Every structure is written in structure tokens, then in C-alpha cells.
């Protein structure tokens, strides 16, 4: 009697899933029906997004087209949002279509900056994630600046980690190239960091170098300032800090601590205090072994790491391996993520700074060319 086929469902087109689907296409398992659910067809590669913002890459160069990737993996592609899990009946609840059954499900949907706790942020701030929303607002801003080159533009970024620093440097560099030198004085940039140090997770060399670079480029750095609210005042956004400091802005970009969608915790999966899925060393949910999770949406209980794209990329191959083992009723193998990792932070001007543990160097063009080569090589695997 032939074995019944099994249903493997991927929720989200994040880095880990893109890698796993690519590997699956090269060596598919028989009698497994694969489905990819994503609310977007084109998924961004986070490593190249600052370069895209800065104008070094086009849209196609920094996005993976999920439809042909799913086809290569012999998978069904469903363009829809997952809004819940029925774990008792093993079904994915979708926004616009009937539930999709699964025997095994993997979740890699990223995260969004936590804006809910700050009054007005959900209404007036532009979160760095979801990325398609960020890129829509960025494209609209570029059009407005080109249409009104003599107007004063005041832009703020909230969040002084690597993501916020790289974003504001990339935005400034792109807008500078867009405008004649005489009009650049109309651009005003502010970076807000709650702590008293920029890039607190990086070494002193990187912190000092980037703090100096922001100053050299005329970006106003506000350390020790907690943004307490955003309000609309006339045609501007009033950014208010707990200290009483206030700045009028035209756009506010939000690049702060990550948060998880509420449906994850509502589903009944074990989560950490922030609502991210708790997984073990095999990338399986601690409460439901038929559920795997990777990337920002997952927290490895024994090896907590920052919410960074490098970890999602590294989780791709072990996720593929363990999904195969689980589907074959074999024990999945543990995965231990690296404790230190190399970060290459772009300045928006064709230079980059390297940071790894206590090591730091740059900025220089050689590091940017190295970063560009690494990123292009990664994206080439999906062409």
C-alpha cells in the first residue's frame, strides 16, 4: 500500500525559506506537497536594502521573485497573508482564502519595529518593516523632493542601532545626489537614540567612527533621547521626547526594537516575552514539534541572538535538513548559531565599515566592494 502524501507549508518568503526552497528544488522529496504562502511576490534581501536606498541597486537586484522560486521547488505559490494557525486541526488561516492544511509548517515572516507603545507612532511614523511599505514611502519621498527641490525637508530616524545608522546615511547620500549642491542645505537629518551610546552592540572603534561620520555629514545626533510621542501640527510631524525636546519633521522613519505579529501568540505556540516563537536547537517550536520557525520571528531558547539577517541566512540549510528528517520520521539535528558575526555597514557613499566582536576597520571602498561581491553572489543563487 503506497504511503499517503504529506503537506509541507512555508509561511513567509524570508531568507531562510528562500534558501530552503532553493535547496528543495535541487533535491525534492517524493510524496510531499509543498506550498509557499506570502503576502508579497518579491521578497527583499536585507543586506542590499541600504544600497538600494542609496541608489546603487535597482529593484530587481535586491529582491527575490518568489513565484519562479516556488515553481523551481515544485511548490504551489499562494499570494495571501497568513493571519493565524489552527494547531489542533493543522491548518493555516489565511486572510483571503480557505485554510490550508499542513502536516509540517515552517514560519519565516520577519518582524516589525515596535511602534504601538509610543503614542502617534503607528499613525505618523514609517516603520522600517515591512520593507515594501518602507520602499513605497521612500519612492514617494524621492518624487516629492525632485518635484520641490527648493523646499526644506526635515527627516528623522528613530533608532541608533546599525539599521538606523545605515538607513539615515543611505537616505542622505541618495538625496544629496538627487539635488544640486546649492539645494542640499535645505535637507535636515536627525537621528534619535534612547541610549547614551550609538550602536551599543558594536565595539568602540565602530561606535566612535560612525558618531564622527554623522557629525562630519551634518546629521544631528540626539543621544539619550527617548521619543515619547508623535503628533501632527499643521503640515509637520512634531517629534516629542521624554526630556521635553521637540523637533518638527516632515518624515519620521522608525527603526527600533523588533516586534512580532499578534496572531503568533494567539495561535497557542510557545513564545518569549516579546511574542516571538520559542524554538529549540532543531528550529522546532518548543510546544509544537510539527512547527518550525526561523529568522526574526523565532527566538532560539538556548542560543538567543540579535534579530539580524545574517542569522536567518545561516538557518536556511539546517532548516532544509531538519524539515527533510522530520518528514521522514527521523530525528532532526541540532544547529548552533555563531556567537560573533561580521557586519559590514555601508555609508551610502560607496564605502563600508567592518565590525566583528572587538574588531573594526574602515570606512573604505575596498570593504564596500567586498560587501557588494558577497551580496551579489548570494542573490545570484536565486536567478
Per-range role (PLM):
Residues 297-347:
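A conserved FAD-binding loop/helix module that cradles the flavin
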Residues 2-76, 166-201:
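Beta1-alpha1 glycine-rich phosphate/pyrophosphate-binding loop at the start
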Residues 77-80, 84, 173-280:
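A Rossmann-like FAD-binding core segment of flavoenzymes
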Residues 123-149, 246-314, 321:
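FAD-site-proximal beta/loop scaffold in flavoenzymes
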Residues 138-186:
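Rossmann-like NAD(P)H-binding beta-loop-alpha module
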Residues 13, 109-110, 256-257:
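Glycine-rich, N-terminal phosphate-binding loop of Rossmann-like dinucleotide-binding domains
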Residues 4, 349-383:
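C-terminal auxiliary extensions adjacent to catalytic cores
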Residues 1-5, 74-156, 253:
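FAD-binding core/adjacent interface of flavoenzyme oxidoreductases
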Amino acid at each position: 500500500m503506497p504511503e499517503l502524501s504529506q503537506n509541507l507549508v512555508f509561511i513567509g518568503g524570508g531568507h531562510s525559506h528562500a534558501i530552503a526552497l532553493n535547496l528543495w528544488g535541487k533535491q525534492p522529496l517524493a510524496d510531499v506537497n509543498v506550498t509557499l504562502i506570502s503576502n508579497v511576490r518579491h521578497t527583499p534581501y536585507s543586506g542590499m536594502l541600504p544600497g538600494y536606498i542609496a541608489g546603487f541597486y535597482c529593484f530587481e537586484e535586491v529582491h527575490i521573485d518568489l513565484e519562479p522560486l516556488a515553481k523551481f521547488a515544485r511548490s504551489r505559490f499562494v499570494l495571501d497573508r497568513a493571519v493565524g494557525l489552527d494547531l489542533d486541526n493543522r491548518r493555516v488561516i489565511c486572510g483571503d482564502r480557505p485554510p490550508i492544511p499542513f502536516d509540517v509548517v515552517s514560519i519565516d515572516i520577519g518582524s516589525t519595529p515596535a511602534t504601538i507603545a509610543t503614542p502617534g507612532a503607528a499613525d505618523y511614523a514609517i516603520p522600517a518593516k515591512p520593507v515594501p511599505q518602507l520602499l513605497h514611502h521612500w519612492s514617494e519621498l524621492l518624487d516629492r523632493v525632485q518635484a520641490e527641490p527648493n523646499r526644506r525637508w526635515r527627516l528623522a530616524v528613530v533608532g541608533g542601532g546599525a539599521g538606523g545608522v545605515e538607513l539615515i546615511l543611505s537616505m542622505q547620500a541618495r538625496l544629496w545626489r538627487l539635488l544640486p549642491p546649492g539645494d542640499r542645505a535645505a535637507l535636515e537629518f536627525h537621528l534619535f537614540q534612547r541610549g547614551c551610546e550609538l550602536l551599543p552592540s558594536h565595539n568602540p572603534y565602530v561606535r566612535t567612527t560612525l558618531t564622527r561620520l554623522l557629525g562630519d555629514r551634518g546629521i544631528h545626533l540626539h543621544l539619550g533621547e527617548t521619543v515619547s510621542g508623535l503628533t501632527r501640527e499643521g503640515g509637520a510631524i512634531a517629534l516629542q521626547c521624554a526630556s521635553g525636546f521637540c523637533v518638527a519633521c516632515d518624515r519620521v522613519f522608525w527603526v527600533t526594537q523588533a516586534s512580532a505579529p499578534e496572531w503568533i501568540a494567539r495561535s497557542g505556540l510557545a513564545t518569549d516575552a516579546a511574542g516571538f516563537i520559542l524554538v529549540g536547537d532543531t528550529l522546532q517550536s518548543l510546544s509544537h514539534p510539527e512547527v518550525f520557525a526561523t529568522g526574526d520571528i523565532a527566538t532560539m531558547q538556548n542560543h538567543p541572538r540579535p534579530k539580524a539577517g545574517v542569522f536567518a541566512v545561516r538557518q536556511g540549510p539546517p532548516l532544509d535538513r531538519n524539515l527533510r528528517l522530520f518528514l521522514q520520521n527521523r530525528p532532526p539535528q541540532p544547529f548552533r548559531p555563531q556567537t560573533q558575526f561580521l557586519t559590514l555597514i555601508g555609508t551610502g557613499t560607496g564605502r563600508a565599515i567592518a565590525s566583528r566582536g572587538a574588531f573594526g576597520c574602515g570606512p573604505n571602498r575596498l570593504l564596500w566592494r567586498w560587501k557588494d561581491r558577497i551580496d551579489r553572489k548570494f542573490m545570484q543563487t536565486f536567478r
